[in-house]
Every structure is written in C-alpha cells, then in structure tokens.
Amino acid sequence: MAALLAAAGIPVGARLTVLSALRTMPFEQAAPVDPVVMAKVLDQRVPGHTETTVLGGEARLVSLDSLSGKLQTGKGRILDLHLLPAAKDTLIALIETIDSPQPDSRLSVFDRNWKLKWNFAPTAPQSAPEGSVMFGAMVYTPASATLTVDWREAGNDSITAREEYLLTPKGVKRAKK
C-alpha cells in the first residue's frame, strides 16, 4: 500500500481528504464558524445538517464527496472546497462566495497545511457596460477541471457574461473556445 501511495505522489501516512482539509481549515477561512461547531457539522457528514455558531448564525454542510465539500458559514456565505491532485502533493482550492447584493467569488489555493499558494480574482469582462459594477460567481467542475465565472451587473440577476478557465495546481488559464 505504501508503494502505491508513493507512486501516486501521496506522502505515506499523510493522505489528504476533504474531511481532513475541512477539519484543519484555519479560522481565518472558516470564520465565523469556530472549530467546535465545525467539528459538530462535519461529524454528522449529512448534507443539510446545521449547527448554531457562537454569534448566533448557522453553519450548514451543503454537500460532501471524495473530492469536494461545500459549507454555508453564515447568511449569504458559501465555502466550496476542492482537492487538486498535484505532482508531489494535493492542493486545496477554496472558493469563497458572498451573496450580497449579487454572488461574488474569489478563489484561493493552499497547500495541505493551509499555506497560501496563490489567489485568483477575475476582472470584469470587457463586454461589461461602462461604469457598471460587476460581480463574478465561480463554480468549479472537477471532471473537466473547469472554473466557470458567471458575471452579473449590480441590481440585475441575469447573467451578463460567462467565462471559463482551466484550473490546475499551478494556476488558472482561460479555456479555449
């Protein structure tokens, strides 16, 4: 088994799982969900399970599978975690989406110890109306390694533009059309 893990580039005895990544997520990323509440939510492993935070908000497990987990960590805030297998290790991709007034996301990629490797915050498309305020909501599709950004103008729920990127352990590049 050790040889198989080593051949796959996974350090022996240190296999990173979605649950272990969520359990070790620093408070800076998980706030306002403290470690005790996070443990209660994750121990259930049942999507929809909700716990009350120390500030009276709710922490809810939205989804969980072998490569990703999604948590609602407050009203209008979603953390979408994905594991990115890399040559020598597995990285953690964390999409934080705030829904106020429109969904707006940012992507941060960390090593297994939650040390920041790089960030990605796309700029509004050139097709955006001049002077408008644009919000980009990200969705990652692991099967195709595609990061989709849906752009909306402030005050308008309709998608104004859609951009697709390929997400790799080294960075993000625009997908070919």
Features from the language model and the residues they span:
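Short, hydrophobic/aromatic-rich segments at coil-to-beta transitions
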Residues: 66-68, 89-93, 144-148
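Terminal domain-start segments
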Residues: 4-83
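Short aromatic loop motif centered on NTY/YTY
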Residues: 117-177
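Beta-propeller blade termini
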Residues: 80-85, 137-139
